[in-house]
Structures are given as structure tokens and as C-alpha cells.
A protein has these predicted regions:
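Substrate-binding pocket helix/loop in short-chain dehydrogenase/reductase
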Residues: 19-23, 27-32, 132
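Short, flexible catalytic-loop segment of classical short-chain dehydrogenase/reductase
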Residues: 107-118
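Alpha-helical segment proximal to the catalytic Tyr-Lys
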Residues: 51, 94-99
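Residue(s) in the substrate-gating loop at a strand-loop-helix junction
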Residues: 66
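Short, small/polar-rich loop/turn modules that mediate ligand/substrate recognition or access, typified
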Residues: 98-102, 161-163
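Active-site helix of classical SDR
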Residues: 46, 82, 90
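C-terminal substrate-recognition "lid" of short-chain dehydrogenase/reductases
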Residues: 46, 140-168, 173
Length: 175
């Protein structure tokens, strides 16, 4: 309709909530399913959109990864590994698609919301949120709005930045 594609945000993701210590809680099909959505899906989207993005001349791809891919934490080992792979793929795609397309990733930490509360269990969610708000340097956690703001920053600005991942965690990595 508009004849161009200036931005692509790969925000689809999935997980299976399994404690990292529960090695029997995940099997090969769990890994394949999680990788399919979290890594292969974004690759296929970029591959399908690359010509339109390059034709724009100054396009941006933003992959939504996770602090799990930086720190090896999160809902499951498969999820952490998939988000680490997405961060690495972000760097590879930045090399391939430049100079016409910038490719970056945002890596949210704990995100406030019902989805996470349901996955973690309300008690664990509230305890984690309270801990992070008390101990992180910024004394707050991510919100969907703060994630969107960072994605928009990569799309509308940061014209010299590609191949990077931005951790959105209120300073959690500093603990």
C-alpha cells in the first residue's frame, strides 16, 4: 500500500517455563519448538523482507531478545539459549544487510505483566519484582511501554548503531 518498508520488529516469542535445574523438564522437541519461533522465525522474516528493507536505504530491524540470552537465566534453558542465538544472529545480519539496513536487538529483563506472573506463579513474580525494585540501581523493572520506547529509539534514531543489543533491566546486570 505504501510502497516501502522502513522497519521490521521481530517480537514473536515463546517459551516453556521449566526450572534450569530440571534437566528432564525439556526434551528435543521443546528446544526445536522454542528455536523455531525465537530464532528461525525472525530469520525467515528478515530473509523475506530484506529486498524491501534494502530498497528503503535506511531501514531498521529490531529483534526482541532477552536478558536471558545475555545472562543465561529466564524461563528455561531452551529459552535462554534461543535468545542468545537471536543476539548472535542480530550481529550476523547487521554485517550482511548494511549499509542500507541497521539490525539491533533489545533485551528486556523482568517485564511487568500478567503473562509473566502466570508463567512464574504469582508469589514468585511478586517476590522477584520486589527484589529487583529494591536492589537494582534504577529501582524499577521493565514495562511493555519501556520496551516499545527502546524499539522506537532504534527505528527512528541511532543512525550509527548496528549489530548491538540493548539490555533493558534497570541495572540488573550490575548486581
Amino acid at each position: 500500500k505504501w510502497g516501502r518498508l522502513d522497519a521490521l520488529v521481530n517480537n514473536a516469542g515463546t517459551t516453556k517455563f521449566v526450572q534450569h535445574t530440571d534437566m528432564d523438564g525439556l526434551d528435543g522437541s521443546d528446544f526445536q519448538s522454542i528455536y523455531g519461533v525465537n530464532v528461525i522465525g525472525p530469520f525467515q522474516m528478515v530473509r523475506a523482507a530484506r529486498n524491501a528493507l534494502k530498497a528503503s536505504g535506511d531501514a531498521s530491524v529490531v529483534n526482541v531478545a532477552s536478558i536471558a540470552g545475555v545472562k543465561g537465566v529466564g524461563s528455561s534453558i531452551a529459552y535462554a539459549a534461543s535468545k542468545g542465538a537471536l543476539i548472535t544472529m542480530t550481529q550476523s545480519l547487521a554485517r550482511v544487510l548494511g549499509p542500507e539496513v541497521r539490525v539491533n536487538a533489545v533485551c528486556p529483563g523482568f517485564i511487568e505483566g500478567e503473562w509473566l506472573a502466570e508463567g512464574m506463579g504469582r508469589e514468585t513474580y511478586e517476590a522477584s519484582k520486589s527484589f529487583l525494585e529494591a536492589k537494582t540501581p534504577l529501582q524499577k523493572t521493565c514495562t511493555p511501554e519501556s520496551v516499545a520506547e527502546s524499539i522506537l529509539g532504534f527505528i527512528e534514531g541511532h543512525s550509527i548503531v548496528t549489530g548491538q543489543h540493548l539490555v533493558l533491566d534497570g541495572g540488573h546486570l550490575l548486581l
